[in-house]
Amino acid sequence: MPKLKTRSSAKKRFDVKKSGKVKHGKAFAKHLFTFSKTPKSKRSNRGTGHLRDMDAKKVIKEMFPYGG
């Protein structure tokens, strides 16, 4: 049986940690300063976040056949 391939789009967007958490970049931050946003929303878009447990299970199961 051939090897299962990891989705290359998921490789670029997610990082699976040893604890099983899935780290991701925040959305809506690419054109951060091109239009008016509140300082609070700019601060909250910095850095990375983690997916919720149910979403993380789906991502790992569907996108990473060998668990990331």
From Swiss-Prot:
Basic residues: compositionally biased ranges: 1-11, 19-29
Segments of this protein annotated with the region Disordered: 1-54
Gene3D superfamilies recorded: 4.10.410.60
Listed GO biological process terms: translation
Keyword terms of this UniProt record: Ribonucleoprotein, Ribosomal protein
Record-annotated disulphide pairs: none
GO molecular function: structural constituent of ribosome
Alphabetized Pfam families for the sequence: Ribosomal_L35p (PF01632)
Family annotation (SUPFAM superfamilies): L35p-like
Entry keyword Ribonucleoprotein: yes
InterPro entries, per database record: Ribosomal_bL35, Ribosomal_bL35-like, Ribosomal_bL35_CS, Ribosomal_bL35_sf
GO CC aspect terms: ribonucleoprotein complex; ribosome
Family per similarity comment: Belongs to the bacterial ribosomal protein bL35 family.
NCBIfam families found in the cross-reference section: rpmI_bact
Protein name: Large ribosomal subunit protein bL35
Organism: Myxococcus xanthus (strain DK1622)
Taxonomic lineage from the root: Bacteria, Pseudomonadati, Myxococcota, Myxococcia, Myxococcales
Protein encoded by which gene: rpmI
